[in-house]
Amino acid sequence: MADIDNKEQSELDQDLDDVEEVEEEETGEETKIKARQLTVQMMQNPQILAALQERLDGLVETPTGYIESLPRVVKRRVNALKNLQVKCAQIEAKFYEEVHDLERKYAVLYQPLFDKRFEIINAIYEPTEEECEWKPDEEDEISEELKEKAKVEDEKKDEEKEDPKGIPEFWLTVFKNVDLLSDMVQEHDEPILKHLKDIKVKFSDAGQPMSFVLEFHFEPNEYFTNEVLTKTYRMRSEPDDSDPFSFDGPEIMGCTGCQIDWKKGKNVTLKTIKKKQKHKGRGTVRTVTKTVSNDSFFNFFAPPEVPESGDLDDDSEAILAADFEIGHFLRERIIPRSVLYFTGEAIEDDDDDYDEEGEEADEEGEEEGDEENDPDYDPKKDQNPAECKQQ
């Protein structure tokens, strides 16, 4: 068996040498064509493919043979470093616990501002002229005369229109402006979300397991009797004993929704379908009515239940993964910065961040391409001494 493997390896090495010889003897398009042809021939050879697969499997099983080759006394020292790493993870967990305490502390300071936001949106409080003053960047160079003219025109338009009170459809607009949320909102959800007055986040009390609750406050409506719909997210804030090195801060481990008390005929999470069935023998036809689930934002409050075994099917895992992402996004971005998602400014900032990364990547690609196409380019000249990188 070893002789066969050695023979296959020799053939593979010889074929690779042939590619190198072709590249040395010929240049230009002919070299590329012949190299491609030789590659195709090699990939059609089952012995070569088997040898390549065996080599790749070996690399996967032993990502670094260096560690295995270390003397026993050195391996002991590596184990000592791993134990230190576990202690680092435990300290990191303490750090995140204190961060959670700070979030709870500052949530109290933010709340008066969020309460004022709620009052303005829902026409409970009318902001003063001073509170409404805002100077967008694009108005920096506009003359006072033009500003006054624009103000007069705006006042005329306001006189012609009836005051809509507050900021209508504020949260619905926020949801529709954010792709992550707009994908959840169906057309039949929109009339209900027009009644959404506020979204709040509540953090777990000190000494309690880390968690947070999203509260969706609704005004009285024709769809359900609940005033508040809730979604609770449970978090793990300490390293897993079975895999301590995977700890990278608190992570959402599960969530619980709430029961929605729908009024008769208003449950948008269900739909009724009718099917016609034909009897095979008699040929008679009957109509069967069936109630099935329906796509809706309000399915957000009925997440899949995780069994005690923790095993979920692929669909449930995907739903929960998306659910956790949405819960985190609402807590970290939407609730504290809702006005910027209402106006679209936060979305533009997010897009700019992605554009800058893309432009940098494109520029790097262009530079690399120029170096490869430069006949005088010597890669050895560009090699820098090894640098110490901080993680």
Curated annotation (Swiss-Prot):
Keywords attached to this entry: Acetylation, Cytoplasm, Isopeptide bond, Lipoprotein, Methylation, Neurogenesis, Nucleus, Phosphoprotein, Prenylation
Record-listed Phosphoserine modification sites: 10, 69, 143
Annotated positions of the 5-glutamyl polyglycine modification: 359-360
Principal location listed in the UniProt entry: nucleus
Residue ranges of the motif NAP1L motif: 125-150
Sites of N6-acetyllysine modification: 116
Region described as Disordered: spans on this chain: 1-32, 132-163, 345-391
InterPro entries per UniProt: NAP-like_sf, NAP_family
Pro-sequence residue ranges: 389-391
Sequence ranges of Acidic residues compositional bias: 11-28, 132-143, 346-376
Comment field on protein domains: The NAP1L motif is required for the histone chaperone activity.
Function noted in UniProt: Histone chaperone that plays a role in the nuclear import of H2A-H2B and nucleosome assembly. Also participates in several important DNA repair mechanisms: greatly enhances ERCC6-mediated chromatin remodeling which is essential for transcription-coupled nucleotide excision DNA repair. Also stimulates homologous recombination (HR) by RAD51 and RAD54 which is essential in mitotic DNA double strand break (DSB) repair. Plays a key role in the regulation of embryonic neurogenesis. Promotes the proliferation of neural progenitors and inhibits neuronal differentiation during cortical development.
Identification of the protein by name: Nucleosome assembly protein 1-like 1
Organism: Bos taurus (Bovine)
Gene name in the database record: NAP1L1
